[in-house]
Amino acid sequence: MDTNKQKALDLAIKQIDKAFGKGALVKLGDKQIEPIESISTGSLGLDLALGIGGVPKGRIVEIYGPESSGKTTLALQIIAEAQKKGGVAAFIDAEHALDVLYAKNLGVDIDNLLVSQPDFGEQALDIVETIARSGAVDVIVIDSVAALTPKAEIEGEMGDSHMGLQARLMSQALRKLTGVVHKMDTTVIFINQIRMKIGAMGYGTPETTTGGNALKFYASVRVDVRRIATLKQGESQIGNRVRAKVVKNKVAPPFRQAEFDIMFGEGISKEGELIDYGVKMDIIDKSGSWFSYKDIKLGQGRENAKAYLKEHPEVAQEIENEIRRAMGMDDSVMMVPENEMSEE
């Protein structure tokens, strides 16, 4: 760059620093590249699929899927993992349907969980913005977008038309939230439902998420959660097999997916994942129907091996550490350059 241009640029930077504060405009080469921190999802496979060991801190995340697919369970597991690391979490219960005992069973510290049950959408999103601006909360979960009903709709008459009100509300809120959560390093997770597009024909999926298109664009990560099988023990249903697909990822390559078990009343089965990934990575030996780790016989059949790991958490932790090392997930901080790898 010639001398005159450099002088003009230096002057412009000084003016910007004076108007907006030092560091408002910097050369990327002068700024230290910081690693992207993450919060574990409670699922080894999903942590791997997300590419950085969990959901990114300081970003907006959307978890969506059909009813009873495990969306809220996954969000509560993320809260539990954040709390285990000493983090503070908030749950905005717009659906007024939080099961406190279930959350406790998943490992959530309910005594220290911040909970709000707002009356309408604007109130919910104002609360989210206020606690995000405090910089004291690590993760905020909103359950769900569909329940963020605008005040005008609640106060209106049944049958009144309120076309596009919720979409406008979400668009306005996300414009304000994106910068705040990044600056304060707070992860905001929106749980969303799916609907069928009216009059959808031809190619492409007939499904869409609620609340307009704003969340699709502002979310750094979008995870599609689907139930793919029912787990049974004899005639009794004991859980669901779930597939989680990362359909958008701005911090790592997208379109990876993971499968894991969600057990009724317990949440994500970490023991099941340890066995699946342990066998896949030759950390656990499978001979016929027997599973063994080093000189330890874990049991005959997958359910017995899971039961052994549940009864012997020190063995489960040792296996998990080996798997995480093999996956390159020793820590929740992964050195991945920030990029815009997927817009949808």
UniProtKB/Swiss-Prot annotation:
Described purpose of this protein according to its UniProt entry: Can catalyze the hydrolysis of ATP in the presence of single-stranded DNA, the ATP-dependent uptake of single-stranded DNA by duplex DNA, and the ATP-dependent hybridization of homologous single-stranded DNAs. It interacts with LexA causing its activation and leading to its autocatalytic cleavage.
Binding site for ATP: 65-72
Keywords per UniProt: ATP-binding, Cytoplasm, DNA damage, DNA recombination, DNA repair, DNA-binding, Nucleotide-binding, SOS response
Gene this chain is encoded by: recA
PROSITE patterns: RECA_1 (PS00321), RECA_2 (PS50162), RECA_3 (PS50163)
Protein location: Cytoplasm
Family: Belongs to the RecA family.
GO molecular function: ATP binding; ATP hydrolysis activity; ATP-dependent DNA damage sensor activity; damaged DNA binding; single-stranded DNA binding
Flavoprotein as UniProt keyword: no
A GO cellular component annotation in the UniProt record: cytosol
Top-rank lineage group of the source organism: Bacteria
Protein known as: Protein RecA
Chief location: cytoplasm
GO annotation, biological process: DNA recombination; DNA repair; SOS response
Pfam family, any one: RecA_C
